[in-house]
Amino acid sequence: MAKKRTINELRQVKDSVYVNRNVKKSSVNFVDEVEEFNATMGKPNNYEPTIPEKKEWQFVYDFILEELEEYKHACETGNIVEVLDALCDIAYVSLGNGTMLHGLKDKIWPAYQEVQGSNMSKACTSEEEAQATVETRSKEQGEPCHYEKVGKYYIVYRTRDKKVMKNINYYRPNLLQFFTSDELSKFI
């Protein structure tokens, strides 16, 4: 029977197992670490944009759903340690495994920054802009919206659940910019 290893012994394995040290590092350290894990465990690492076979992407999809259920259970039971575990696992699987499975390692960080900029464009920079946004979004939603001043911005919320509404000057993230025409031609 194999001897059970201690946490410190397992950490030493983690620190010593670097299958491919010549791999180009990304701006997202944990994606690099998942890449190392995949290489060590014989899991796929793709380096060009791809939609792999269904069994491969379905595994990641199902794993994300499983981790979301663990997150929900941890919240329902008030277990903050399990909340942290679930959040780490969700990031590991979705941003780590998903990124490497779909060959998006070099795109994930700039794409994330583009999405962050888009999300931040939901903030109104003037009260007039907030008032116009409230009027527009209330009509679109068919229910009341309101704004609140938060720091130097005006944030428009759907009143019922305080969901942040898109500013009338919101911009959609342009994720197309991160693909070459050759990369995209494989999917059209």
Residue map of PLM features:
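Flexible "arm" and connector segments at domain edges
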Residues: A2-I188
